[in-house]
Regions:
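Sec-dependent N-terminal signal peptides
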Residues: 4-13
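Sec/Tat signal peptide C-region and signal peptidase I cleavage site
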Residues: 15-19
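Thiol-based oxidoreductase modules, predominantly thioredoxin-like and allied folds used
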Residues: 22-26, 62-86
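A short beta-strand-turn-helix
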Residues: 23-41, 71
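Loop/turn elements at helix/coil->beta-strand transitions in domains of secreted/extracellular proteins
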Residues: 38-42, 73-76, 107-111
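Short pre-active-site segment immediately N-terminal to redox-active cysteine/selenocysteine motifs
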Residues: 39-42, 46-50, 98
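Conserved redox-active cysteine motifs that mediate thiol-disulfide chemistry
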Residues: 46-62
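Non-catalytic, surface beta->alpha helical segment in thiol-disulfide oxidoreductase systems
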Residues: 97-138
C-alpha cells in the first residue's frame, strides 16, 4: 500500500512539473540557437535568489500549467541570476537596476520588449502577448 501511495504521489508530482515554465540555464548563444532551430522567440528571466518578487513569480506564476503552456508554445526560456556573470552582463546592458526583469528577443538578438517587476499570471501573459503582437507589426 505504501508503494502504491508513493507511486501515485510521484506521478502527480511529475504531472504538475510538466506544466511549469521550463527554463534553460545554457549560454545565451546556445539558447538563441535553440530558438532558431525551434522557430521560437527568446525569453530571459533576470532574477536573484534574495529577491522576494522574483521568488513570488517563480512560485505563483511560472509554476502554473497555463503559463507553462503559453510560454512553451512561444519561447525558448532561460533564466540568469544577476549575481552571476551572465546575469550581471545582461542586467548592465538591458536593465535599469530593478528585478525581476524579463527580456524578449527575436532570433537575431534584437530586443523586442521588456517587462519589469512581478505581476499576476493573467497580467504577465497579457504583457508578454502585447510584446509579441508589437513585434509582428515590425
Amino acid at each position: 500500500m505504501k508503494k502504491l501511495i508513493f507511486v501515485l504521489l510521484l506521478a502527480l508530482g511529475a504531472g504538475a512539473a510538466q506544466g511549469q515554465v521550463k527554463f534553460e540555464t545554457k549560454s545565451t548563444d546556445a539558447v538563441r540557437e535553440m530558438a532558431i532551430k525551434s522557430g521560437k522567440l527568446v525569453f530571459i528571466d533576470l532574477y536573484a535568489s534574495w529577491c522576494p518578487p522574483c521568488r513570488m513569480m517563480e512560485r505563483e506564476v511560472f509554476s502554473r500549467k497555463d503559463v507553462g503552456d503559453f510560454m512553451q508554445q512561444r519561447f525558448v526560456a532561460a533564466k540568469y541570476n544577476t549575481d552571476k556573470p551572465t546575469g550581471k552582463e545582461l542586467m548592465k546592458r538591458y536593465g535599469s537596476g530593478a528585478i525581476p526583469l524579463y527580456l524578449i528577443f527575436d532570433t537575431q538578438g534584437e530586443l523586442l520588449g521588456r517587462i519589469q517587476g512581478a505581476s499576476a499570471p493573467k497580467e504577465f501573459m497579457e504583457s508578454v502577448q502585447k510584446i509579441i503582437d508589437g513585434s509582428k507589426r515590425r
